[in-house]
């Protein structure tokens, strides 16, 4: 089984040198000079993976995946990253992995079934760290104040569900 990662540095030569040092036959690296885009993508995919899985079915989840990628592109550009980063390993690659398994996807499944965040955490995931929820608490005040609900409705819906402990309502 091979694993892949992205090494990001403003100086692409440094990123490639680091990648060459850590690459093996089973651990491959890609390179990027979009440090902001890579860092932000790797964080927000945790939120969007919960949204995707909340769809409770492949057809709905595929539509939520598409809309999530659209919102990620908007957010990456908003924070001065490169939109192409969203379409690479740090963006949709990492989003896919997070959506098909892991703690964020489990939480998304519970939210999609009608549990509030606190109910699901207490009943099913008491000992688990939910990175997307931790991030939601950190970024919600900024997102609510600075970013239009019309630009990122999925993100806003999940932030409200987690921060206000409401049932997740996605109007998409």
List each model region and its residues.
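Short, surface-exposed connector motifs at secondary-structure boundaries
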Residues: 1-2, 154
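NAD(P)-dependent Rossmann-like dehydrogenase/reductase catalytic/cofactor-binding core
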Residues: 35, 45, 52-53, 77-172
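Internal alpha-helical scaffold of NAD(P)-dependent oxidoreductase catalytic cores
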Residues: 2-85
């Amino acid at each position: 089984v091979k694993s892949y990662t992205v090494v990001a540095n403003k100086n692409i030569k440094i990123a490639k040198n680091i990648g060459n040092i850590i690459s093996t036959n089973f651990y491959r690296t890609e390179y990027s000079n979009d440090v902001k885009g890579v860092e932000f993508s790797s964080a927000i995919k945790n939120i969007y993976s919960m949204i995707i899985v909340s769809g409770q079915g492949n057809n709905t989840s595929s539509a939520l995946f598409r809309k999530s990628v659209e919102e990620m592109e908007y957010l990456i550009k908003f924070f001065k990253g490169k939109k192409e980063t969203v379409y690479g390993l740090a963006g949709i690659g990492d989003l896919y992995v997070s959506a098909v398994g892991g703690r964020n996807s489990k939480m998304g499944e519970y939210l999609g079934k009608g549990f509030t965040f606190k109910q699901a955490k207490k009943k099913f995931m008491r000992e688990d760290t939910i990175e997307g929820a931790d991030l939601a608490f950190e970024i919600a005040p900024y997102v609510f104040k600075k970013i239009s609900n019309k630009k990122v409705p999925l993100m806003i819906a999940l932030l409200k569900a987690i921060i206000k402990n409401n049932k997740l309502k996605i109007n998409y």
